[in-house]
Amino acid sequence: MSTEPLSINPLSAKPLSATQEPSTSSKPSRREQRAAAQRFIETLQGTAFPNSKRIYLTGSRDDIGVPMREIQLSPTLLGGSKDDPQYEPNEPIPVYDTSGPYGDPAAQPDVHVGLAKLRANWIAERHDTEALSGVSSDFTQQRMADAGLDHLRFEHLPRPLRAKAGKRVTQLHYARQGMITPEMEFIAIRENMGRERIRGEVLRQQHPGQSFGALLPENITPEFVRQEVAAGRAIIPSNINHPESEPMIIGRNFLVKVNANIGNSAVTSSIEEEVEKLVWSTRWGADTVMDLSTGRYIHETREWILRNSPVPIGTVPIYQALEKVNGVAENLNWEMFRDTLLEQAEQGVDYFTIHAGVLLRYVPMTAKRLTGIVSRGGSIMAKWCLSHHKESFLYEHFREICEICAAYDVALSLGDGLRPGSIQDANDEAQFAELHTLGELTKIAWEYDVQVMIEGPGHVPMQMIRRNMTEELEHCHEAPFYTLGPLTTDIAPGYDHFTSGIGAAMIGWFGCAMLCYVTPKEHLGLPNKEDVKQGLITYKIAAHAADLAKGHPGAQIRDNAMSKARFEFRWEDQFNLALDPQTARAYHDETLPQESGKVAHFCSMCGPKFCSMKISQEVRDYAAKQETEAKPIEIGMAEMSQEFRSRGSELYHSATSLQAEESK
């Protein structure tokens, strides 16, 4: 077997060892996984979902073009004859799209070059930033000077920006000054989801929701966005060094958002695979992505991700800081952590998770817990506090952290280091003590015009979930809440995307602004590409269910379009309206693979004779034809019953036999 080494240039056009023998196992080898990821990104091009097209809704200026996906629908057959059928068109359905250029068939993304700098002019025209002559971080300087890393480095590194002396460049600062930024206008258009384009009365129908105090205007304006940001109820993660990102907002008075976690570890994954996961995540609806890398080449991996990400990127800086001290938590210090913040801020990280609420006096509160401290960042800081017997440097230097964030517009995601790791530990003293401290830190961050959101649990049974939301709103001053699930039971490893999706839907309804996805691999291993998709689909369902329950304007349009297509047996439209068209189509075709199955007025669940919707259609048609009010449904049902008996007692009919019968 060849001993030719793996191509060491990540993402290079040169393929990985062409002579490498494929693995004979059912599970791909590490080499095969990396090769597959490289092929994916080397052949990457803008791709739309089936029967969808990319549209751009324009704003008040030429450089505001908000991407949407528009799902094209087939017409409804009204009647007529075989030779002269009568159809009624169905209007296309616009939907929120996070995929950036990767979802535009006209785009030709090149990961080696990175995405276009959408926000560069907006940032420049505010005249409050300056390009640095070099990087500020000592660690970054060391990496740049290491020629041995040239083969890993993103080639087109931009010069970092920073606020001019005496200036603050955060969206919160602008909002408080009464300024409506292009980012805010972009967001207002995006949040409305093009629903003003929908004319059909059937599609616009919606049940009233229960918003639990959320304010959901019928039309979201740029001024409303500004007001919500100024009040601290919403954030726009938008580092000035990540101009490639498309503006989005996180707040309970907006659509519920979903975050996807990616990142390498000490034992698995490569730069290629993480870039692939990024693109994959945005395709399946990730509103933000957190890079939680803990393995080798964290700095270089993050650069590739940022330069190719159309969504905000978050990190947990303490993870990288710990790598710099070889995993010894006691050796962490403020100087090293500060340097890590500068490193990541100048790369373009949009929000930092900071576990500044883990105080020394709170650690003993966890002693009687069933599962102790399960947050990685929380356990690191707890160990540091106990080792030094003092408050953490994150807490002691929090104002300095805010100064750094204000200079780059990095939002703070105040981490819940003492979140419960089992339902038994939910809502305990330690959890809420930390939450109250996070509320105090929120006010400090706001003094520096730094945007803030609050992280939440975790593992919480259903009956205890709402208290988490009410406590956060009260003690954290309505700052956006961002939760991991919560998981509602602990008995389902391998299915924790389900157990947590239940809790996510509930807390999203109660007011949580962003849900951090959980994949099937939670508690078991690092997720792969398919796990990422499963987690995202589950959480997009949870977020959408929460929007419906809150009564978010226009949230029901897609549901109504799906129901109409289902009732009219427009199978292709049903597939295309689904969150996951590929899976919907595949499941249908398992039992009805013929093309005739795509037009049949039944599916394999009930067959043609017991399809409730087909029966209902026939009853409706009969009532209309009779033009009588003499209980048409009962009469129709009786006649349908007689017709079914006359056709025989078979439960299932083939698609071909049904079509033959209908053509008579």
From Swiss-Prot:
Composition-biased stretches (Polar residues): 1-10, 17-27
Gene Ontology BP, a term: thiamine diphosphate biosynthetic process
Record keywords, A-Z: 4Fe-4S, Iron, Iron-sulfur, Lyase, Metal-binding, S-adenosyl-L-methionine, Thiamine biosynthesis, Zinc
InterPro entries: ThiC (IPR037509), ThiC-associated_dom (IPR025747), ThiC/Bza_core_dom (IPR038521), ThiC/BzaA/B (IPR002817)
Entry note: cofactor: Binds 1 [4Fe-4S] cluster per subunit. The cluster is coordinated with 3 cysteines and an exchangeable S-adenosyl-L-methionine.
Enzyme Commission numbers on file: 4.1.99.17
Region (Disordered): 1-37
One cellular component term from this protein's GO annotations in UniProt: cytosol
Residues holding [4Fe-4S] cluster: C603, C606, C611
Pfam families, alphabetized: ThiC-associated (PF13667), ThiC_Rad_SAM (PF01964)
Binding-site residues, substrate: N261, M290, Y319, H355, S375, R376, G377, D416, G417, L418, R419, E455, Y482
Assembly mode: Homodimer.
Family: Belongs to the ThiC family.
Name of this chain's protein: Phosphomethylpyrimidine synthase
Organism this protein belongs to: Pectobacterium atrosepticum (strain SCRI 1043 / ATCC BAA-672) (Erwinia carotovora subsp. atroseptica)
UniProt lineage: Bacteria, Pseudomonadati, Pseudomonadota, Gammaproteobacteria, Enterobacterales
